Amino acid sequence: LFLFLEKKIFIMMPNKMIESTEILIIGAGPAGSVAAALLRQQGREVVVLEREQFPRFSIGESLLPQSMEYLEQAGMLRAVVEAGFQFKNGAAFMCDGQYTEFDFRDKHSDGWGTTYQVQRATFDHILAKEAQRFGAQIRFRHEVTSVDIEPEKPVVTVKDPEGNVYQIQANFILDASGFGRILPRLLKLESPSNFPVRGAIFTHIEDRINCSSFDRNKIRATVHPQHGDVWFWTIPFAQGRCSLGVVAETSFLERYKGSDLERLQRIVSEDESLHTLLKHAQWDTPARHIIGYSANVSSLSGKGYALLGNAGEFLDPIFSSGVTIAFKSANLAAALLERQFAGEQVDWQTEYGQPLKRGVDTFRAFVESWYTGGFRRIIFHQGHQPEIRRMIAAILAGYAWDLTNPMVKETARRLTALEALCI
């Protein structure tokens, strides 16, 4: 028995009512909002369940130029441009007094060469409102507590802000829950990451940087002077603020006692260049931390569902790849769902999982090389041909799926070969 209320379909079951929708998205972050917008433009019915109330804080604040293409395709670019975020055109690296930078406009791949550095509370809220503008229904403070994928159409159990529990059935579920990793946790899809357990301590500050050589249009990664696998991010925002964080294995971070802000300040003081750069900073925001952020899953899709962005796999903050991977996954999934709803057979493993992982694996090779020191030796080496740097710049700009770039093919082997030349 079906009951129609306010254009919504409800399935009458014994002693309960199950709501029905075409697409259910878990999480209203970048992946969820972009997927919702794309699917609404296809005419699909979309419900988004978001555990938190927006705006809310998140890290992952330095976008990559490749992201602009996905925002444009989703019809969200204008809203982002008009928000007045900090312009970004590249990335800079510092290690042992050495400095190098990449201008993303000078890259191998075609496409956007500039983007923005964003406060995620504002950025994510903009994307969510854009998804709503396209007609997606977003329910904030609605938490998924269980999922059943055994029925023909999966059923999700949800708790609303008042503590009431209800169920919703969907033709397909997209998990865009980010670090919450709802489906991997509930369906036991999680698998160990190949990376050591690392953590990050971070905050926002009024930076008061008056150094003329500091380029606010670039994210900067600074390597700790005594510990090569420890590094700091400095992400300038508009209005004289920046995001500051340190990334290290948990054993290193545990050496420092006190509040997160005190720990971060002590570690920053160990790098003379960064300490000097921020000597006038106003530390006006409590620091936060995240531990064990790297994650993997046994599969990116299954019966009636697919995992988007960080819900599937998160590598590391070093190359700011998270939001770009989130957008790429949303773009791929929305295109496949359009075909699936048109009656085509879709092989999610070969048409979603494999293409997505191609770029993820390119970023993975870069991350691994960063922590072994190989990537640092490559980028500070002066003898490379300009085209080599353009190939690297393209991947740093997010074009990790561009097969015209030799660095995307056999990335780890090519990085090893380049490192061998840095003598």
Where are these regions (language model features)?
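Short beta-strand to alpha-helix junction loop
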Residues: 108-129, 254-259
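N-terminal Rossmann-fold NAD(P) dinucleotide-binding loop
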Residues: 32-33
